[in-house]
């Protein structure tokens, strides 16, 4: 058996999330169907770095699976992409030892969130950005990002549906935002993220940009450990799982 690590991109618009569900089209479902066909009717279970919700996209999701087939890495990529629908692509395939695990070996994850900040929505971007018609104050949001960096208990920024039973302490190494034209890109890089954590943080950052909150309010929100202190969870379509990094052979890859 060989362990294969795959870097996967997908457009989440037409998927009911990543995790397989009966009677729903999911990313895991189409990946496992492609592997089923490659293995001539044998079911192959995949493991992912994490799950994404309905409408959330991925540039660099990572999965692994074990296969008895002896195929060169480059041929794996070509074969799988031939069997996959157009909204899912294998970007890279690497052979790994059995110690590698797509979920448990993760060192760092990076998410990006895109906001279209102009009066009128763009019909061609509607499934790929969050539209905010009110002018946002970029400098205030940049200041607020700094308060999210570091090691904190992110209970206030975790969905009530979170399955995490233990500590909700996480470390964010980098949080920032920058603007290009009318598009604002937010970047979150950390050791791990709670369920809906990025989308809840985005809700607060947008409120700061609108002048509804002050940047330093994040200090009190973190201390309160109360999800009710924060408003809605932001829409999924602006969110992208950008990159997953692993510590392998002493290198962060």
Swiss-Prot record:
Active site, UniProt feature: 53 (nucleophile)
Catalyses which reaction(s): uridine(38/39/40) in tRNA = pseudouridine(38/39/40) in tRNA
UniProt KW keywords: Isomerase, tRNA processing
Keyword tRNA processing part of the UniProt annotation: yes
Molecular function, one GO term: RNA binding
SUPFAM superfamilies associated with the record: Pseudouridine synthase
EC number: 5.4.99.12
One Pfam family from the record: PseudoU_synth_1
KW Isomerase (keyword) present: yes
Gene Ontology biological process terms, A to Z: tRNA pseudouridine synthesis
Amino-acid positions noted as binding substrate in the UniProt annotation, renumbered to this chain: 111
Top-level division of the source organism's lineage: Bacteria
Residues spanning the membrane: none
Described purpose of this protein according to its UniProt entry: Formation of pseudouridine at positions 38, 39 and 40 in the anticodon stem and loop of transfer RNAs.
Family: Belongs to the tRNA pseudouridine synthase TruA family.
Subunit structure comment from the entry: Homodimer.
UniProt-recorded name of the protein: tRNA pseudouridine synthase A
Organism whose genome encodes this protein: Oceanobacillus iheyensis (strain DSM 14371 / CIP 107618 / JCM 11309 / KCTC 3954 / HTE831)
Gene: truA
